[in-house]
Amino acid sequence: MSISLQRFQQIAASIALAFGSVAGAHAATITISCGSVGQDFEFCKKTTEDWAKKTGNTVKLFTPPQSTTDILALFRQMFAAQSSDLDVINVDVVWPGMIKDHLIDLKPYSKGAEKEHFPSIVANNTADGRLIAMPWFTDAGLLYYRKDLLEKHGEKAPTTWEELAATARKIQDAERKAGNADMQGFVFQAKAYEGLTCDAVEWLWSYGGGNIVDDKGQITVNNPKAAKALSTAASWIGTIAPTGVLNYGEEDARGVFQSGNAVFMRNWPYAWSLGNGKDSKITGKIGVSALPKGGAEGKNAATLGGWQLAVSKYSKHPAEAASLVMYMTSPEVQKERAIKGSYNPTIGALYKDKAVLDANPFFGSLYEVFTSAVPRQATATGLKYPEVSAAFWNATHDVLSGQASAEDSLKKLEGKLKQVKRNAW
């Protein structure tokens, strides 16, 4: 999705008003994009306030769009204009290779702190020997379930998608019969956006259908196992998942689950602390497990997610901006965010921290899920990844919405990807 140049100019013209000041006026004023709504924004606000008090600088918050697709479009237009309006930006795990030319090298400021973080993420954030972003938190898709409902109906957490469908249908129908007409079996992210790419990569991988392209950049998505995965997911729509799921993002799915109206949910780790919050209807009733396998011969798969923080090379205060990045990605801040917000740390030592594990018991039992998550193929497809992902999520959405069969959609997708690739990614 593209943001018009006129819209960008409007944003740029009013950006000073869009920012909310969080400290007194001193040395430098650093503007940061790091949280859009709710808990995410509040954590961003608190952390930047703390840094401002420690350093005497001023921090202003810019609230980015909620959609990752829209955020990237906005940043790209700001980079094209060489705008200095934003000093620090939040960077999705698949973006570093796409925007590397617009970010400063953080190594002169990190003092080796990156060595504490997961090496694979640091490598992802390194381009041409430059550390262009610091890991902020990592993510991997998880299965949330109502452990009280499973126990009530004599079921266990499913290990395959087939088991999930059967259990979801059984409990959904029973709960509706008992009076909850709004009960759904399974909610997830099926809107046509990057979140659907994440979900669908998990489905493909779990059935042995590979990824959109392989590590060498070869287009592999058009295969029978991938078709099986998408056909299976399409069978959920209107049976165990509401048709409205075709317009669900993460927060839409969480809203249904947290209101007590879903048996299962696919979402990121952040949903744990919110689901167990004071205003949640299902506090203490949530279980978490790895996402199911694609049949008995399949495997568990979780898409790698997560966010980084980086400094724009157009910033007028790179040293101060880098200082803020290093503070926000530090062990002390990551620990606090893990305990209070269930944000997965990118620092391995924190997965052995008692306070972190007490707040998030699944961090220990599902540690392997987080360290072996499946990447989207941004490295293999380079600057063309946004086109690749958009083609994939649109093809998947066509299958889920019944507009095309999995086989036809994947064949068409293969042709589209060949056009995008041409001679090389």
Question: Residue ranges of each PLM-predicted region?
Answer:
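Glycine-centered hinge/linker elements that transmit conformational signals in sensory
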Residues: 168, 215-246, 291
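Long, aromatic- and glycine/proline-rich binding clefts that accommodate carbohydrate-like moieties
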Residues: 120-125, 289-290, 339-391, 398, ...
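Short, well-ordered beta-strand elements
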Residues: 28-38, 57-64, 87-88, 132, ...
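Extracytoplasmic "Venus flytrap"/periplasmic binding protein-like
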Residues: 31, 47-119, 124-126, 148-159, ...
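Conserved C-terminal helix/tail region of periplasmic/extracytoplasmic solute-binding proteins
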Residues: 53-54, 58, 151, 371-425
